[in-house]
Amino acid sequence: MLLSIGMLMLSATQVYTILTVQLFAFLNLLPVEADILAYNFENASQTFDDLPARFGYRLPAEGLKGFLINSKPENACEPIVPPPVKDNSSGTFIVLIRRLDCNFDIKVLNAQRAGYKAAIVHNVDSDDLISMGSNDIEVLKKIDIPSVFIGESSANSLKDEFTYEKGGHLILVPEFSLPLEYYLIPFLIIVGICLILIVIFMITKFVQDRHRARRNRLRKDQLKKLPVHKFKKGDEYDVCAICLDEYEDGDKLRILPCSHAYHCKCVDPWLTKTKKTCPVCKQKVVPSQGDSDSDTDSSQEENEVTEHTPLLRPLASVSAQSFGALSESRSHQNMTESSDYEEDDNEDTDSSDAENEINEHDVVVQLQPNGERDYNIANTV
C-alpha cells in the first residue's frame, strides 16, 4: 500500500512538472512588447519597446518603415495636421500622439483621417506600457491603420533625434503576439480538465490495484483457520523452505492444505502481505469463488467422454492431508502394496500350476498309442 501511494505521488509530481514546463513554454510565446527601430541622419540606430493596440490592423510581417511626425495638436482628440503634401505620395508617415484627454480609438481614427499610415501613442509621466483598447464598436470598424504604445522616455528620445525634420526614420517591427485573454484562459481550462482526468484515472487505478491486492492476500480470520502444529523430534518435516533453518522442538509450524509446513513467523507474513499461495507448490491456501467454479467446470469436462478421451486416464491428485495423518496414510499405502504383492504371487502360483497340468497332459498324450491318442483327442474336441 505504501508503495502504491508512493507511485501515485511520483506520478502526480511528474504530471505537475510537465504541465508547469509546458505552461512556461507557452507563456514565452506571448511577448508583450514589440520593437521600434529608429535611425537618425547618421544612420545610428536605437531600439525602443512598444505594445501593439488591440484594435486596427496588424503590422505587416516585414515591418512598417516611415517618417515620424509630431501630432498637432499633440493629443489628437480633434482633427490633426496631415503629413507634408510634397512627400505624401512617395513616403510613409507615422504620427506621434500624446496620451490623455480622449480615448485611444479617437486619437488613432483622427490620425488615419489625416493620412498617416500608423500611429504611436506615448505615455505621460510614466514609462509603463498600456494595452490600448476600445469599447466603441462603430469607431473600431472605421480604424484600419496599426498603432502602438510607448513610454514617455522613448517618446522624448524619438522627438530629439529621430523625427522627420531631423532626418530620421522608423521601422515598426512586428513580433509574434497572441492576445493573452483569448489564448491563455482556454489553455488553462484544457490543462485543468486534463489534470482532473489524470487524477481521476490514477485514483481509480490505485483503488483497483488495492482491491486486487486484497483478493490475492489472506485475511486474518482465514489465517486462524489453518492448523498449527508444535514440532517434535521424529516428525515428518525437518527444514523450513523459507528460512532454511531446521525445526527444533516446540517450534510452531503452520500446516497448509497442500501438506507443506513452515514456521509461523515465516509463512504468515507471506500469506497476509504477498499471496495466499504455498511458497513451494503455488497451490492456493483458500480458493476463491472464481477458483472453485473453474475447478468444478474442469472436473465436469474431465468426466465427459468424447472421441479424444484417452483410454488410460491419469491418476487423480492426492487430496490434502493433515500433518498428523501422514504416517497413517503411508502405513495404509504399505499395507495395500503388500496385499497387492500377495495377490500377484497367488495369481502367479495358479498360473504356474495350470501350466504344469497342461504339460503333464501333453506328456501323457504323447506316450499313448496313436489310435488311443486320436480317440482321446476326438473326445476332447
From Swiss-Prot:
EC number(s) recorded for this UniProt protein: 2.3.2.27
GO cellular component terms given for this protein: cytoplasm; cytosol; endoplasmic reticulum; endoplasmic reticulum membrane; endosome; intracellular membrane-bounded organelle; late endosome membrane; lysosomal membrane
Zinc finger residue ranges, RING-type: 240-282
Signal sequence interval, chain numbering: 1-34
Catalytic activity: S-ubiquitinyl-[E2 ubiquitin-conjugating enzyme]-L-cysteine + [acceptor protein]-L-lysine = [E2 ubiquitin-conjugating enzyme]-L-cysteine + N(6)-ubiquitinyl-[acceptor protein]-L-lysine
Zinc-finger found in the keyword field: yes
CDD domains linked to this entry: PA_C_RZF_like, RING-H2_RNF13
Post-translational note: Autoubiquitinated.
Tissue occurrence: Widely expressed (at protein level). In normal pancreas, expressed in islets, but not in ducts, nor in acini (at protein level).
Major localization listed first in the record, in broad terms: endoplasmic reticulum
SUPFAM superfamilies the record matches: PA domain, RING/U-box
Record: glycosylation sites: 88
Sequence intervals crossing the membrane: 183-203
Region (Disordered): 285-381
Membrane topology term: Single-pass type I membrane protein
Pathology noted in the entry: Developmental and epileptic encephalopathy 73: A form of epileptic encephalopathy, a heterogeneous group of severe early-onset epilepsies characterized by refractory seizures, neurodevelopmental impairment, and poor prognosis. Development is normal prior to seizure onset, after which cognitive and motor delays become apparent. DEE73 is an autosomal dominant form with onset at birth.
Protein name from the UniProt record: E3 ubiquitin-protein ligase RNF13
Organism, scientific name: Homo sapiens
Gene: RNF13
